[in-house]
Protein backbone atom coordinates (compact mmCIF):
# COMPACT_ATOMS: atom_id res chain seq x y z
CA UNK A 1 0.00 0.00 0.00
CA UNK A 2 1.00 3.62 -0.42
CA UNK A 3 0.94 4.10 3.32
CA UNK A 4 3.61 1.51 4.10
CA UNK A 5 5.85 2.90 1.34
CA UNK A 6 5.49 6.33 2.85
CA UNK A 7 6.42 5.04 6.31
CA UNK A 8 9.63 3.50 4.99
CA UNK A 9 10.49 6.72 3.18
CA UNK A 10 9.86 8.79 6.30
CA UNK A 11 12.03 6.49 8.43
CA UNK A 12 14.91 6.78 5.96
CA UNK A 13 14.86 10.56 6.13
CA UNK A 14 16.32 10.65 9.63
CA UNK A 15 19.43 12.77 10.00
CA UNK A 16 22.09 13.00 12.67
CA UNK A 17 21.31 15.50 15.41
CA UNK A 18 20.54 15.94 19.09
CA UNK A 19 17.71 15.20 21.48
CA UNK A 20 17.22 15.65 25.20
CA UNK A 21 16.85 12.58 27.42
CA UNK A 22 14.37 13.14 30.23
CA UNK A 23 14.04 9.61 31.53
CA UNK A 24 15.92 6.31 31.47
CA UNK A 25 14.92 3.59 33.92
CA UNK A 26 14.15 -0.10 34.31
CA UNK A 27 12.26 -0.16 37.60
CA UNK A 28 8.89 -1.86 38.04
CA UNK A 29 6.96 1.39 37.54
CA UNK A 30 9.04 2.66 34.61
CA UNK A 31 6.35 2.01 31.99
CA UNK A 32 3.76 4.07 33.87
CA UNK A 33 6.22 6.80 34.83
CA UNK A 34 7.47 7.17 31.26
CA UNK A 35 3.88 7.47 29.98
CA UNK A 36 3.04 10.12 32.59
CA UNK A 37 6.20 12.03 31.76
CA UNK A 38 5.37 12.13 28.04
CA UNK A 39 1.86 13.39 28.86
CA UNK A 40 3.13 16.09 31.22
CA UNK A 41 5.86 17.21 28.84
CA UNK A 42 3.50 17.33 25.85
CA UNK A 43 1.07 19.49 27.83
CA UNK A 44 3.85 21.93 28.73
CA UNK A 45 5.63 21.92 25.36
CA UNK A 46 3.12 20.91 22.66
CA UNK A 47 5.43 22.10 19.86
CA UNK A 48 8.26 19.75 20.85
CA UNK A 49 8.00 16.07 19.90
CA UNK A 50 8.42 13.51 22.69
CA UNK A 51 9.62 9.97 21.96
CA UNK A 52 9.03 7.09 24.36
CA UNK A 53 11.02 3.96 23.61
CA UNK A 54 11.48 0.59 25.25
CA UNK A 55 14.77 -1.23 24.81
CA UNK A 56 14.36 -4.11 27.20
CA UNK A 57 14.55 -3.67 30.13
CA UNK A 58 14.78 0.13 29.87
CA UNK A 59 12.12 2.73 29.17
CA UNK A 60 13.42 6.00 27.75
CA UNK A 61 11.81 9.36 27.10
CA UNK A 62 13.68 11.65 24.74
CA UNK A 63 12.42 14.96 23.35
CA UNK A 64 13.10 17.34 20.51
CA UNK A 65 14.70 17.14 17.07
CA UNK A 66 17.68 19.50 17.12
CA UNK A 67 20.13 19.79 14.24
CA UNK A 68 22.89 21.25 16.37
CA UNK A 69 24.13 21.28 19.93
CA UNK A 70 23.42 24.97 20.51
CA UNK A 71 19.70 24.55 19.74
CA UNK A 72 19.58 21.57 22.09
CA UNK A 73 21.38 23.57 24.81
CA UNK A 74 18.96 26.45 24.41
CA UNK A 75 15.97 24.14 24.89
CA UNK A 76 17.64 22.33 27.80
CA UNK A 77 17.98 25.71 29.56
CA UNK A 78 14.26 26.32 28.99
CA UNK A 79 13.23 23.06 30.64
CA UNK A 80 15.96 22.47 33.23
CA UNK A 81 13.88 23.79 36.12
CA UNK A 82 11.10 21.27 35.36
CA UNK A 83 13.52 18.48 34.40
CA UNK A 84 16.73 18.96 36.41
CA UNK A 85 18.22 15.59 35.42
CA UNK A 86 17.71 16.08 31.66
CA UNK A 87 20.76 15.80 29.41
CA UNK A 88 21.62 16.01 25.70
CA UNK A 89 22.13 12.89 23.59
CA UNK A 90 23.31 12.52 20.01
CA UNK A 91 20.68 10.61 18.02
CA UNK A 92 19.19 10.33 14.59
CA UNK A 93 16.39 12.88 14.42
CA UNK A 94 13.42 13.58 12.23
CA UNK A 95 14.36 16.57 10.07
CA UNK A 96 12.50 19.68 11.26
CA UNK A 97 9.55 20.34 8.94
Regions found by a protein language model. Give the residues of each.
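Acidic/polar low-complexity segments and flexible, solvent-exposed patches
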Residues: 1-97
Amino acid sequence: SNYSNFKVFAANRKISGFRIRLFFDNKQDSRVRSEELVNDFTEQYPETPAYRTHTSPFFKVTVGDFRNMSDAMRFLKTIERSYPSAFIVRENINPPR
